[in-house]
Amino acid sequence: MKNVAVLSGDGIGPEVMEIAISVLKKALGAKVSEFQFKEGFVGGIAIDKTGHPLPPETLKLCEESSAILFGSVGGPKWETLPPEKQPERGALLPLRKHFDLFANLRPAIIYPELKNASPVRSDIIGNGLDILILRELTGGIYFGQPKGREGSGQEEFAYDTMKYSRREIERIAKVAFQAARKRNNKVTSIDKANVLTTSVFWKEVVIELHKKEFSDVQLNHLYVDNAAMQLIVNPKQFDVVLCENMFGDILSDEASIITGSIGMLPSASLSESGFGLYEPSGGSAPDIAGKGVANPIAQVLSAALMLRYSFSMEEEANKIETAVRKTIASGKRTRDIAEVGSTIVGTKEIGQLIESFL
């Protein structure tokens, strides 16, 4: 039995998760009997019910599962809590660390029908865009020790530590090279080797691994500031973009914006064993929660990534992705991706349309 922990969370999470599970079951067909979907509380709703953003029973549910399908967490209601008790820091970050979800895959796709939704000129986008940002997720300056604040007055200071081991760099680089082999066979590694010692080491390790195991894959390097510019002026040069944690955090958000809607973008966070957490790239959007207008496509595509990476069900994953493309081509859109001539529909209608193409 394939167990999936379903953590809908807060805001629009429950309503888009409902659509994703329905699409998932339709795509699986008779194979749905091989799956068990078990729900757990996480984030703000978990705080309200248990006092903790990641209750022990939810963590146990995840440990007994093969994958986590995650919605979104957070909202104004919980913003005044201590940082470690807030939904994202108290739930999502501990889940990543607990399961060693070191590889974050963030596709940034612009479908031809949606190229006018991008803030980037249509002549730059051409007939669409397909970039995969590969971000190291459990190391670097976000987790490095020591960190803290000391002193007082004009002598007060704060510090963080940016640190990477050879093992951490090699394992994320391997995922990038392996992903590139299934795409357009090109990796762009991002660093700041003209300033940072960790970046010098990062670049050295990536080059060594490339020569030893992946010489068939095209490899090039960009400083992070240049990469941020190139994503805007010439995004089609990229296939797989390999980044350490902080650089990947920034560049993946930039890449998501050039697609025109963050409501379209899924993500996968994977461990070495293949265990994964799958979630939309956007937030909980409390301002539109419960109104039936949220775009469920990112959650649906996250479910497709789960089938691909945690269960090796490529055919079913492709079916969902094809159904999403056909839905977009039909001209019916949620309001975040609507343009002149398209028909604006709600969350449930988009879900029904996706299912009609399965």
Curated annotation (Swiss-Prot):
It comes from the Bacteria. It catalyses: (2R,3S)-3-isopropylmalate + NAD(+) = 4-methyl-2-oxopentanoate + CO2 + NADH. SUPFAM superfamilies: Isocitrate/Isopropylmalate dehydrogenase-like. It is an enzyme of class 1 (oxidoreductase). Its cofactor is Mg(2+); Mn(2+). Keywords: Amino-acid biosynthesis, Branched-chain amino acid biosynthesis, Cytoplasm, Leucine biosynthesis, Magnesium, Manganese, Metal-binding, NAD, Oxidoreductase. Pathway: Amino-acid biosynthesis; L-leucine biosynthesis; L-leucine from 3-methyl-2-oxobutanoate: step 3/4. GO terms for molecular function: 3-isopropylmalate dehydrogenase activity; magnesium ion binding; NAD binding. InterPro entries: IsoCit/isopropylmalate_DH_CS, IsoPropMal-DH-like_dom, Isopropylmalate_DH. It is found in: Cytoplasm. Its main location: cytoplasm. Substrate binds at residues 96, 106, 135, 225. SMART domains: Iso_dh. GO terms for biological process: L-leucine biosynthetic process. It holds the Pfam family Iso_dh. Homodimer. This is 3-isopropylmalate dehydrogenase. It comes from Leptospira interrogans serogroup Icterohaemorrhagiae serovar Lai (strain 56601). The lineage of its organism: Bacteria, Pseudomonadati, Spirochaetota, Spirochaetia, Leptospirales. The gene is leuB.
